[in-house]
């Protein structure tokens, strides 16, 4: 089965490819389809943004399409950066810029109040417009400085208490198994392989 993953984010595409390695699903990114327009993520929720991206690209390409919107929600910041996670420090922000802004915004937050969660909503849409949503969540704590070299985004700052390591420090197989994206993708794959 072939599926378009509506992203140009190479880190995200690699993560999804690894998560689907043991399935019969072959993924392609947007770059495989030439000059497709960007979809403006103007929804108020992860679900709205994921659905809009998947439905638009499925219609334009005629392919079964999955899109996700995901991000970090920090309790002490009222759920920020939330849907703005990728551009928290500005539209052209790098991961390092976003991490720096998060640390600045949390500078006065004490150790026991740094709870956060990564959220992911995946939308699977057909070219005809039928869509299903799948979600995942990973709870953790934001550190005062980054640790680890792996992963991308906020991974170096996000401590997973059960492992005593950041997502950037965890072996890839563990990260993929427990991640918010991994959980959502597991639900999506189960749906694709369910009878009827």
Curated annotation (Swiss-Prot):
The active site is at 69 (proton acceptor). Substrate binds at residues 7-12, 70, 152-155, 175, 180-181. GO terms for molecular function: dITP diphosphatase activity; ITP diphosphatase activity; metal ion binding; nucleotide binding; ribonucleoside triphosphate phosphatase activity; XTP diphosphatase activity. Binds 1 Mg(2+) ion per subunit. Transmembrane segments: none annotated. The keyword Zinc-finger does not apply. Its cofactor is Mg(2+). Coiled coil: none annotated. It comes from the Bacteria. The keyword Hydrolase applies. GO terms for cellular component: cytosol. It is an enzyme of class 3 (hydrolase). One of its GO terms (biological process) is purine nucleoside triphosphate catabolic process. InterPro entries: dITP/XTP_pyrophosphatase, ITPase-like_fam, RdgB/HAM1. Its EC number is 3.6.1.66. Mg(2+) binds at residue 69. Keywords: Hydrolase, Magnesium, Metal-binding, Nucleotide metabolism, Nucleotide-binding. It catalyses: XTP + H2O = XMP + diphosphate + H(+); dITP + H2O = dIMP + diphosphate + H(+); ITP + H2O = IMP + diphosphate + H(+). Gene3D superfamilies: 3.90.950.10. Homodimer. Belongs to the HAM1 NTPase family. Pyrophosphatase that catalyzes the hydrolysis of nucleoside triphosphates to their monophosphate derivatives, with a high preference for the non-canonical purine nucleotides XTP (xanthosine triphosphate), dITP (deoxyinosine triphosphate) and ITP. Seems to function as a house-cleaning enzyme that removes non-canonical purine nucleotides from the nucleotide pool, thus preventing their incorporation into DNA/RNA and avoiding chromosomal lesions. NCBIfam families: PRK14822.1, RdgB/HAM1 family non-canonical purine NTP pyrophosphatase. This is dITP/XTP pyrophosphatase.
